[in-house]
């Protein structure tokens, strides 16, 4: 049976400042930790990325032509405050006013994120969100933006608090590149959630117009053998690290007893302790019912198997299928069922996981209000032929995920939109320029844009709301 989506559904495309803009030192932009980290550790940098800093009128015109009626944009904190605090950079402010005006001119609603992996270097090198002073700096930056950019109707505090802690302190593929420090992972999650809560409360107390929420990456975790209690436990612990700890903070305003039991077990095995304060929980509690929406970024699921041994994680950044490894002491290891398809980067393709995650939010956090799927898409080594890309695999991937969103809506969940990652090809943080996601192919040499086959397909779905 052909499935449909509501008439008022947002069919969006997603971007992020650092992955798309380029112009990393232009017009007074301050440095971010990624600038030097990429130079020192990777085979690429964020120059020129997709040159969105200059080419945004082209991308927004294409968006309008191809039925894309929403765009995720992030503000680069260091374009507004080059050192994260203190002096404002007027050229950065002017750029975003111009960008938002162009969005509205093209009838593409901007959903604006304040922080997408790019803390200004001055604050990042001072402990990033492990340093509680940076909570204050973030809230001040948020307040400036709420006041200044009154043309924005949809605000998101953070993009993917989970993968920030994970990338910076567990896998170690994000600056500062620390590995296997679970206490830092949870402390980063917690302090960022307090920052989120305080910004949301300020937004509501000040009576700003528009809506505010947060974007969480929520990869669904399953036991490898659902009949084995040890595998079930491994999946539960892995879910706490990546999903439940953060969701509890967002919607319960505290961590449930079951969540804290899991956290304490993980820290007993791996070492370290957390600094969780009374005033933190007061802030979390005050904001728990104020989120207007939850953004869910979903790409994949994982299967977990019980495991007794030391932590070892190998990140597959070059698309060499089968080269990744993930096992955490006291938690478990990832082991995929043989019959589930994977990308070249070992990301498991499992649309059912998105449905299950959406239904979990509805069941466990009934105060969620509404959901946007704020990222979903297929990273691929696209072949550019005849000025396009025949990306049937991407079409199939997006189609199947839109279908389960339709199912979730039928089953009573309030899902209001979908943003494909990514609008145009951008650079991928730890995978470079080879891993493409866009509806529009970018020739990174010339910065020309070419609609892929998926763009024509997406346009038809957006126009008809029929998934076929």
Curated annotation (Swiss-Prot):
The keyword Magnesium does not apply. Keywords: Glycosidase, Hydrolase. Its EC number is 3.2.1.85. Disulfide bonds: none annotated. One of its GO terms (biological process) is lactose catabolic process via tagatose-6-phosphate. Gene3D superfamilies: Glycosidases (3.20.20.80). Pathway: Carbohydrate metabolism; lactose degradation; D-galactose 6-phosphate and beta-D-glucose from lactose 6-phosphate: step 1/1. PROSITE patterns: GLYCOSYL_HYDROL_F1_1, GLYCOSYL_HYDROL_F1_2. GO terms for molecular function: 6-phospho-beta-galactosidase activity; beta-glucosidase activity. GO terms for cellular component: cytosol. D-galactose 6-phosphate binds at residues 19, 116, 159-160, 297, 428-429, 435, 437. The keyword Nucleotide-binding does not apply. Pfam families: Glyco_hydro_1. It catalyses: a 6-phospho-beta-D-galactoside + H2O = D-galactose 6-phosphate + an alcohol. The active site is at residues 160, 375. InterPro entries: 6P-beta-galactosidase (IPR005928), Glyco_hydro_1 (IPR001360), Glyco_hydro_1_AS (IPR018120), Glyco_hydro_1_N_CS (IPR033132), Glycoside_hydrolase_SF (IPR017853). NCBIfam families: lacG, PRK13511.1. Belongs to the glycosyl hydrolase 1 family. This is 6-phospho-beta-galactosidase. It comes from Streptococcus pyogenes serotype M3 (strain ATCC BAA-595 / MGAS315). The gene is lacG.
